[in-house]
Regions:
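Predominantly five- to eight-bladed beta-propeller fold
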Residues: 32, 104-109, 113-116, 166-198, ...
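Short loop/turn segments that connect beta-strands within beta-propeller blades
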Residues: 64-67, 121-125, 161-164, 262-266, ...
Length: 440
């Protein structure tokens, strides 16, 4: 592991300003004058020692090793095919050869949004619309980068890049306030912290998703006014209403189920995942094994999380991990579960502290990382070495340090200054950028 390459120090200079006779204004405090200096928007490129970031209308790559620019990956003013004025965000295909360019983003709820997406080929500089049928939600790459699935109007669609971006409609029963395919309903998004319920299997031959039937959930209405952001001119004279399904305590939730679609035969099957009648399915995830996807289930009390390994072709589910905690399974624990190779990284506070438990794909515990302190972030797992990189509060509640836990059980602290350390690792785990601050 190469040592720390770039070290950013964030110090607030209030004392210096005042001792120099400077006048402290409200604008100084609320503006950027005393903001910490850091590199923002770093997006590590998988398997490399480079990262990408947005700079105006461009996406530019930089070297972790030198900090110097490597190249321009995307320039909105220099594309072939479709032309766009700008963009809001982007994501790489798993093979790094293409990008999804996100434009015209419209927020829906706290985590959900719809946008107009474009497929960009980095080598040819060609930009093509993902779909001409209207804005899309949660576009999801297949692992080979040759397919993209997305949701529109509560239905799932599939785009095949090798077939001139041919578009197939996978589901047809989606309907607002009745059935949702591939997206969580409002209460699952809000309370369980996710906005995507759709994944390919590892070889891209199957598409799997969660389906929410909210037809029996009672409706709640909100008044809408012109003054909302963005402004609604249609409500200038009279307020309107937005009605959606909102299950209050003691009332029916959506009925959730899991499904798979064979991309070659177009056959759709329901996956046989056991679940309590009033329980939840808070995640669906891909693994590196084409015969396995992982589906989470949770009881209504939310103190029991089950991980099922499901074969998307046979539809058979097998319980591999049953996680029980004294109070409730934390949202950040669910979000930080990783499936890499034959390993499952599971954060849990079952001991009273948030530690990291490493299982194999059969649910057998291999090792425990942590101690009498909380692991506060999981940065990644190097499949080549078995090293796990994480942030922890091992020195105290107001301190964060970066660590690596080796496969042999040895743990090494990678940061040497007490305070608050936050890391961004390169895709090959050879470098990381550390952002540091303290209260002085």
């Amino acid at each position: 592991m190469k040592r720390l390459l770039v070290f950013f120090t964030a110090l607030l200079m209030f004392a210096t300003t005042m001792s120099a006779g400077g006048k402290l204004t409200v604008r100084d405090i609320t503006g950027s004058k005393f903001s910490a200096k850091m590199v923002q928007g770093m997006n590590p490129i998988a398997g490399t020692d480079t990262y990408a970031r947005i700079e105006g209308k461009k996406i530019v790559s930089y070297s972790f090793k030198t900090g110097k620019q490597v190249g321009v990956l995307f320039d909105a003013d220099n594309t072939l095919g479709k032309k766009i004025d700008g963009f809001d965000s982007y994501s790489f295909s798993p093979d790094g050869k293409r990008m999804l360019i996100q434009t015209k983003t419209e927020r829906i709820y706290r985590r959900s949004y719809k946008a107009v997406f474009y497929i960009y080929n980095i080598a040819s500089r060609r930009l093509d619309p993902l779909s001409d049928g209207g804005p899309q939600q949660i576009p999801t790459w297949s692992e080979d980068g040759q397919q993209v699935a997305f949701v529109r109007d509560n239905n799932i669609f599939l785009v095949k890049l090798l077939y001139d971006n041919a578009e197939i409609q996978v589901t047809k029963d989606g309907k607002f306030n009745e059935v949702i395919n591939g997206l969580p309903d409002w209460v699952n998004e809000e309370e369980l912290g996710f906005n995507k319920a759709l994944t390919f299997n590892a070889d891209g031959t199957m598409l799997c998703w969660l389906r929410y039937d909210e037809s029996k959930v009672k409706t709640y209405s909100l008044q809408m006014y012109k003054g909302l952001a963005p402004e609604n001119e249609e409500y200038a004279d009279y307020p309107g209403e937005y009605s959606y399904k909102y299950p209050k305590a003691g009332h029916d939730n959506s009925v959730v189920s899991a499904w798979s679609y064979d991309i070659k035969s177009h056959k759709i099957n329901r996956l046989q995942v056991p679940m309590d009648a009033d329980g939840y399915m808070p995640r669906i995830k891909m693994t590196d094994d084409p015969t396995r996807i992982i589906i989470y289930t949770m009881n209504r009390h939310q103190d029991q999380l089950c991980l099922y390994s499901v074969n998307p072709r046979t539809t058979v589910a097998q319980l591999i991990i049953k996680e029980e905690v004294p109070k409730y399974v934390k949202e950040e624990a669910m979000e930080n579960i990783r499936f890499i190779g034959n390993n499952i990284l599971l954060p849990s506070d079952r001991s009273g502290y948030m530690n990291l438990y490493v299982y194999n794909m059969n649910g057998q515990l291999q090792r425990t990382i942590g101690g009498n302190f909380d692991i506060t972030a999981v940065y990644g797992y190097d499949a080549k070495t078995g090293d796990v990189y994480y942030q922890a509060a091992a020195l105290g509640a107001t301190d964060r340090q970066i660590y690596v836990s080796h496969k042999n059980g040895k743990t090494v602290r990678l940061t040497d200054k007490e305070g608050w350390n936050t890391a961004v690792f390169s895709g090959d785990y050879q470098y990381f950028v550390n952002t540091w601050s303290d209260y002085n």
